[in-house]
């Protein structure tokens, strides 16, 4: 379910490395990329991180895509004092451990939800005569730490902004059928839906 997203990121990295190396690399030295595949699993991610550091002798690590996997592999990188940077994972807790070798580029989940709800408010206020008038929200997300954070922050900022929080529908990641969840969301009948899904689940 996550393979397509992983391949898209790999394609982008390969293109960037090709362009950087064609321009002389970094301080005259070419970049060499070694890939590890977490397969979306914490244990596999930890094994791959160990391999990259102890066998491939990488100087730094980028990743991972999922917040849960990033949480555990960042511990491995920290133990080996190897710099790690994530551009994707958004869980609030990732930078709460005081690690010296872990860095994030992506905003936290709290920031995303705060800005989503502010956008909905701005959209509603932009043209009072428009059909968009958001007074209530609900959440659809997978039942992980990240999804639970999404629901918590959505409710918090809804109350802060005077919006009615209609509820949350959390599902098992990678579920083959989300019909019942869709029906639950329909019954909640929010003016806007805040979703935090991986691509295959969102489709």
Predicted regions and their residues:
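Residue-level signal for short, function-critical loop segments
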Residues: 1, 39, 141-144
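Beta-alpha junction/loop-to-helix N-cap segments that form part of ligand/metal-binding clefts
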Residues: 4-12, 19, 23-99, 105, ...
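Conserved hydrophobic residues forming the short capping helix/wall of the S-adenosyl-L-methionine
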Residues: 17-24, 124, 158
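Surface-exposed acidic, glycine-flexible loop patches that form ligand/cofactor-binding
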Residues: 23-26, 126-132, 187
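Residues that mark the start of a beta-strand
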Residues: 32, 135-136, 192
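Glycine-rich phosphate-binding loop signature in dinucleotide/nucleotide-binding domains
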Residues: 52-57, 131-132, 185-190
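Extracytoplasmic ligand/sensor domains, especially the bilobed periplasmic-binding protein
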Residues: 58-168
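Extracellular/periplasmic bilobed ligand-binding domains
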Residues: 151-203
């Amino acid at each position: 379910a996550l393979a397509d997203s992983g391949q898209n990121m790999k394609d982008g990295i390969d293109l960037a490395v090709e362009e950087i190396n064609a321009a002389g690399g970094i301080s005259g030295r070419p970049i060499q990329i070694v890939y590890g595949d977490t397969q979306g699993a914490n244990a596999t991610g930890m094994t791959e991180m160990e391999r990259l550091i102890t066998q491939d002798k990488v100087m730094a690590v980028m990743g991972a895509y999922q917040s849960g996997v990033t949480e555990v592999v960042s511990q491995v990188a920290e133990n080996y004092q190897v710099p790690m940077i994530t551009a994707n994972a958004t869980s609030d807790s990732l930078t709460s451990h005081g690690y010296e070798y872990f860095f994030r580029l992506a905003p936290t989940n709290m920031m995303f939800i705060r800005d989503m709800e502010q956008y909905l408010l701005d959209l509603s206020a932009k043209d009072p005569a428009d059909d968009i008038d958001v007074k209530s929200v609900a959440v659809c997300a997978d039942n992980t730490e990240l999804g639970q954070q999404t629901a918590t922050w959505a409710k918090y900022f809804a109350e802060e902004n005077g919006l009615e929080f209609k509820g949350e529908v959390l599902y098992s990641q990678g579920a083959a059928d989300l019909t019942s969840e869709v029906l639950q969301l329909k019954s909640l009948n929010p003016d806007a839906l805040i979703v935090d899904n991986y691509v295959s689940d969102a489709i």
